[in-house]
């Protein structure tokens, strides 16, 4: 019914006009014809899910410039998701998408928690929608937190249905909610149990045994011990029931300020140094109270500074690092680059892509996080000193940096099970406020800060730079970021373990009823079939070979890289403010920003960290040892699979990293086949090999953003938009121009 003209290019001539122009607007299409194209599709409801409102004869637009093509169907809203029920086969022409199918969220489903902003189109003008509406839009545009943009035309829908569906979507995605009203509890009550995967070995850190196991694994049990003083959350609602502190620390000290001002263990290095975190004491104005706090902190200092403990270096993240407002502001600007309404908008912004990207500061924030993690790693690895991370509640940037350092230093955290256990330990049990930071209850936009997404982006930089070092793939990180907004898993929907345990329904249930059992996101079989799960595991990853006892004695606590570092780096320098020279700095840092602002330690380790960084990168990479990311400007890249996957124009058919991976997998399968033949000749038992994902075998037909990108169309726009040609001058002039020099400054 609608025609599309080709776009000419080249020469200095104007592009030819389309050979066919349609004079029939969508409004003139007969209703009977529309009803024929609309197919009845069954709405799949999860246990406990209820239909709230719906509208029929809704047109879902294909995101393409100047073409109002799409598919008709029903738009429904449940207490779990917004769903479009149409003819998916005509709307999607993508075999890879169907093979990597999420069993919980369909292609045309959006969880209510994933909705970021809702816009209405009135007379071709887009306006944000809030609260009660006096006039209802003819088009509905939904921006999602996973950066999808959905367009729905309501011109052919009955007026009563338009009011019902628009009001329902606005109310259920933007109105403040109570925690117990989340779909999480409805689902848990309906399923009456959990479908756990027996192969899931993720350590949950909800028992003393889990913490003791981690201490033994990292050889930290000599200097640190697990305490149960907060069992039943008698001391603090913020802390987990069990955690680890220095062995000589009295339990009375933990109780004194509800866990504030206590050094809590995160991880131990092979050389005996450890990573610790501490929350600040309550701010006091009274001199007497300040003196009490000073005496308390002085006692803590003496406890952690005497032998066998190493010297301590503090990192005050509240005053000398990123602020939450910086992160929030940067991501708000950054995400706008990918919330594209149509291909015309994409091409218009393409010419100023780099300036927009730079002005958002998101990549610079990632670089600063990686740089700070390198500095902490240098203290632990090269200088053999403990590092104490200080933050107001020790639940935001402490979680990010402590996790990032462990990913860089501990190969176990680069396995899938180890990475999931790390998130459980540092984020879930560490008291990160997922409920507030993701704004699941829509109670405070100011509290919504993507700290966890920033962490995943930092990890992706490492995965991108060192693929063989990680058992999981970037696809794993992408679906993990999507799982933040799926309210059937409890992992990312509470502010603390205490909040989760007290809202399991125990106090409100009858004596005959059982408490609710909530699912964990780590059981990936809930979301994906086994074939799809193969894309979550890196087929090029090889586990660290186990050494025999004789070899273990010779290299027990050594990294390969440590021996190549200058021996002088392990000695402390009086210029760096370690506590042996500046015994009052811990106390000053913890007594509030009023004092800590006077202490300038933002770049104390710059010189030594640079030497450590350059020395490491001059050696061959040990994928099972220490990893340091490249942090030079061009090395920090955009996580294309997550941020660009819904933009067709950003795809490369048969190109990108997926094409390279496909060829590597073909070679890997051939090597495995030859190995099996050799073993068969020697009458050995066949070895178990990792199966290369069949979805990647035809890499020529796949998109560079596989397995998420849609391949139903390709833009006919030129690589450089016409607006860019006009700005740059003629073609001859463009060919003679030199690249513009941009000073990136010091890394």
UniProtKB/Swiss-Prot annotation:
It comes from the Eukaryota. Pfam families: 3-PAP, Myotub-related. InterPro entries: MTMR12-like_C, MTMR12_PTP, Myotubularin, Myotubularin-like_Pase_dom, PH-like_dom_sf, Prot-tyrosine_phosphatase-like. The modification Phosphoserine is found at residues 564, 601. GO terms for cellular component: sarcomere; sarcoplasmic reticulum. It is found in: Cytoplasm; Sarcoplasmic reticulum; Cytoplasm, Myofibril, Sarcomere. Residues 548-575 are annotated as: Disordered. Coiled coil: none annotated. PROSITE patterns: PPASE_MYOTUBULARIN. Keywords: Cytoplasm, Phosphoprotein, Sarcoplasmic reticulum. Residues 449-558 are annotated as: Interaction with MTM1. PANTHER family: MYOTUBULARIN-RELATED, MYOTUBULARIN-RELATED PROTEIN 12. Acts as an adapter for the myotubularin-related phosphatases. Regulates phosphatase MTM1 protein stability and possibly its intracellular location. By stabilizing MTM1 protein levels, required for skeletal muscle maintenance but not for myogenesis. This is Myotubularin-related protein 12. The gene is Mtmr12.
């Amino acid at each position: 019914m609608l025609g599309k003209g080709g776009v000419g290019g080249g020469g200095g001539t104007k592009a030819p006009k389309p050979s066919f122009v349609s004079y029939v607007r969508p409004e003139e299409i007969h209703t009977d014809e529309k009803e024929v194209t609309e197919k009845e599709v069954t709405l799949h409801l999860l246990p406990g899910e209820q239909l709230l409102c719906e509208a029929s004869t809704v047109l879902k637009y294909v995101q393409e410039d100047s073409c109002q093509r799409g598919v008709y169907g029903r738009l429904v809203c449940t207490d779990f998701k917004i769903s479009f029920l149409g003819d998916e086969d005509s709307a999607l022409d993508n075999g890879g998408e169907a093979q990597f199918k999420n069993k919980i969220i369909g292609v045309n489903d959006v969880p209510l928690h994933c909705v970021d902003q809702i816009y209405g189109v009135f007379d071709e003008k887009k306006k944000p929608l809030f609260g009660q509406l006096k006039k209802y839009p003819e088009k509905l545009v939904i921006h999602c937190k996973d950066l999808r943009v959905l367009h729905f035309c309501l011109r052919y829908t009955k007026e009563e249905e338009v009011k019902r569906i628009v009001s329902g979507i606005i109310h259920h995605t933007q109105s403040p909610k109570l925690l117990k009203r989340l779909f999480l509890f409805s689902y848990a009550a309906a399923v009456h149990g959990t479908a756990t995967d027996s192969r899931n070995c993720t350590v949950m850190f909800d028992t003393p045994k889990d913490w003791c196991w981690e201490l033994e694994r990292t050889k930290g049990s000599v200097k640190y011990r697990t305490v149960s003083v907060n069992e039943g959350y008698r001391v603090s609602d913020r802390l987990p029931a069990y955690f680890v502190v220095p062995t000589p620390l009295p339990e009375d000290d933990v109780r004194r300020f509800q866990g504030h001002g206590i050094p809590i263990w995160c991880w131990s290095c092979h050389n005996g140094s450890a990573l610790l975190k501490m929350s600040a004491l309550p701010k006091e104005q009274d001199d007497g109270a300040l003196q009490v706090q000073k005496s308390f902190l002085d006692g803590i200092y003496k406890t952690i500074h005497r032998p066998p403990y190493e010297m301590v270096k503090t990192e005050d993240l509240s005053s000398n690092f990123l602020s939450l407002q910086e992160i929030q502001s940067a991501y708000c600007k950054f995400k706008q680059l990918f919330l594209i309404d149509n291909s015309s908008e994409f091409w218009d912004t393409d010419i100023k892509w780099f300036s927009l990207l730079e002005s958002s500061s998101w990549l610079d924030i990632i670089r600063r996080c990686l740089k700070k993690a390198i500095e902490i790693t240098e203290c632990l690895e090269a200088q053999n000193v403990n590092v104490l991370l200080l933050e107001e509640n020790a639940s935001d940037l402490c979680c990010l940096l402590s996790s990032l350092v462990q990913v860089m230093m501990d190969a176990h955290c680069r396995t899938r099970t180890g990475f999931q256990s790390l998130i459980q330990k540092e984020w879930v049990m560490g008291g990160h406020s997922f409920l507030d930071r993701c704004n699941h209850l829509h109670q405070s936009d100011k509290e919504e800060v993507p700290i966890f997404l920033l962490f995943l982006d930092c990890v992706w930089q490492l995965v991108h730079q060192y693929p063989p070092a990680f058992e999981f793939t970037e696809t794993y990180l992408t679906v993990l970021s999507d799982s933040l907004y799926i309210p059937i898993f409890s992992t990312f929907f509470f502010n603390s373990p205490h909040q989760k345990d007290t809202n399991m329904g125990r106090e409100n249930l009858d004596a005959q009823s059982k408490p609710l059992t909530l699912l964990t996101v780590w059981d990936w079989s809930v979301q994906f079939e086994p074939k799809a799960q193969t894309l979550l595991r890196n087929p090029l990853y090889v586990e660290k070979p186990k050494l025999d006892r004789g070899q273990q004695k010779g290299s027990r606590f050594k990294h390969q890289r440590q021996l190549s570092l200058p021996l002088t780096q392990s000695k402390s320098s009086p210029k760096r403010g370690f506590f042996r020279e500046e015994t009052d700095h811990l106390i000053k840092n913890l007594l509030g920003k009023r004092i800590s602002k006077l202490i300038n330690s933002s770049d104390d380790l710059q010189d030594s960290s640079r030497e450590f960084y350059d020395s490491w990168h001059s050696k061959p990479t040990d994928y099972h040892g220490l990893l340091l990311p490249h942090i030079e400007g061009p090395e920090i890249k955009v996580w294309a699979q997550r941020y660009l996957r819904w933009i067709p124009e950003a795809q490369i058919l048969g190109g990108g990293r997926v094409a390279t991976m496909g060829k590597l997998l073909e070679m890997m399968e051939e090597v495995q086949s030859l190995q099996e033949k050799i073993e068969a000749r020697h009458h050995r038992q066949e070895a178990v090999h990792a199966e290369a994902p069949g979805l990647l075998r035809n890499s020529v037909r796949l998109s560079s953003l596989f397995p998420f990108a849609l391949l139903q169309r390709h833009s006919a726009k030129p690589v450089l938009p016409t607006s860019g040609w006009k700005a740059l001058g003629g073609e001859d002039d463009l060919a003679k121009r030199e690249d513009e020099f941009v000073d990136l400054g010091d890394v």
